[in-house]
């Protein structure tokens, strides 16, 4: 199976320009390609992951990827897929975000590969010094307003309005493609399905300035969920690639909770498992869905890819401890990850009666209720059921001297921190 055929089997091709020409080029030459990532936050998120991993797939097939950080375009704002005008971010903010995103992208590509090392570029390097007159003469002259108005990213904003700033975005992205074509021999741009208009604008600029040049575009479909909710969002917010914003445990849990209807598609999109391995998991899903083997494989592969082996091991340990109730063997760092979003209470002082702590931490509404909860076996301390209403929590109940985990009932957890 050639690269394009594999991408199609994985469901990673939404649209291409001249599919036959692109297949021929990929099969005959080492192709330089790029994908752009605008810094709209201080971290990339899992919505960016399909594009990042597609760059990696191209590199593994022998091609040369360029990850382009949009230090300049991030100052402007892409109207694609947006119903209203973006808020402009300060230059210093975008610079800081660009540096963070550059570091994140570096984890997924090989910069030492023999013959096809990856590169990371920042389009501020060439758009920043560009003066208005040069831009209008060398780029703007090649775009008619009629052509730009016909693009979906503009059409969708006709009613609500679009500023000249965002209207000009596609010309800046087109200029990126031309610049990389000239300086790096870049022949292919890939991006999300909402980037089709911007990608074809780049091809148009290359054609008008370079004649019948062979350059191509490929878009990746928008990742969807069978239940209709937005991919990459949970009740607690966006799933980020930065472990400080989304812990490896939360990240692992996101994937392990994948719907049966989505899991095989996600294995194709987000893992490097072979066709045979994925088909075996698909068969197991049909025959024994309760084992959730496909979800476990997905969660393990993607967590390892993004956060590494050790973070994966920690995420699995936390998951198993929470499932079994065996909290006492977790490290303080693992407890902090696993209980990041549960209610927490800071206890100042030494030993404390359990009844008193349950009330002061808001776990039980009154001392009477606290005693009832304890007597009824509803209170667990570090995974151990305590039914002694006279129990005193001492230093022995502090995990690594920092935390006590209290559970009320089957699932309601509370984290006690010690000042």
Swiss-Prot record:
Domain S4 RNA-binding, first and last residues per copy: 352-419
One GO MF term attached to the UniProt entry: ATP binding
EC number: 6.1.1.1
Catalytic reaction annotation: tRNA(Tyr) + L-tyrosine + ATP = L-tyrosyl-tRNA(Tyr) + AMP + diphosphate + H(+)
Disulfide bonds: none
Binding locations of L-tyrosine: 34, 169, 173
GO annotations of cellular component type: cytosol
SMART domains linked: S4
One GO BP annotation of this record: tyrosyl-tRNA aminoacylation
Family annotation (PROSITE patterns): AA_TRNA_LIGASE_I, S4
Keyword Amino-acid biosynthesis: no
Residue intervals passing through the bilayer: none
Motif 'HIGH' region: chain residues: 39-48
Subcellular locations according to the entry: Cytoplasm
Short motif 'KMSKS' region, span: 230-234
InterPro entries on file: aa-tRNA-synth_I_CS (IPR001412), aa-tRNA-synth_Ic (IPR002305), Rossmann-like_a/b/a_fold (IPR014729), S4_RNA-bd (IPR002942), S4_RNA-bd_sf (IPR036986), SYY-like_C (IPR054608), Tyr-tRNA-ligase (IPR002307), Tyr-tRNA-ligase_bac-type (IPR024088)
One matching Pfam family: SYY_C-terminal
Record SUPFAM superfamilies: Alpha-L RNA-binding motif (SSF55174), Nucleotidylyl transferase (SSF52374)
Assembly with partners or alone: Homodimer.
Functional summary from the UniProt entry: Catalyzes the attachment of tyrosine to tRNA(Tyr) in a two-step reaction: tyrosine is first activated by ATP to form Tyr-AMP and then transferred to the acceptor end of tRNA(Tyr).
Name of the protein: Tyrosine--tRNA ligase
